[in-house]
């Protein structure tokens, strides 16, 4: 479920039988929702999978503070990746994949890599740094600077 309203999702979950599982798809409020009992099924996790994995493992181990420290900063990053127009969120996911060395080029079918502006991508870079979501910071910086240079900046 993705209502993009944390309290509404909690209310719906509260009306379900205990045997039912509700997966949150709320890419804006997932930290509190997962902590409060929603299972996660999030597109945002594709953008920062190592952070998500470490945070969920911490939560499973009962270390709520570590969970919050790891996953908390990723909410702002997810909000930027999924900012309106939301249908272009894949550009942000592909961009982070490229920055992190998982793709050899920042290119998407149909030219969708150009669906987001450089300022939008720059904010993704800033938020990814703050969230410790750049797996290879030096590579990410080099690739970001190369993209800026190609665009005359």
Can you say where each PLM-predicted feature lies in the sequence?
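Catalytic alpha/beta core domains of metabolic enzymes, predominantly
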Residues: 1-87
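C-terminal alpha-helical cap/extension of soluble enzyme domains
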Residues: 53-153
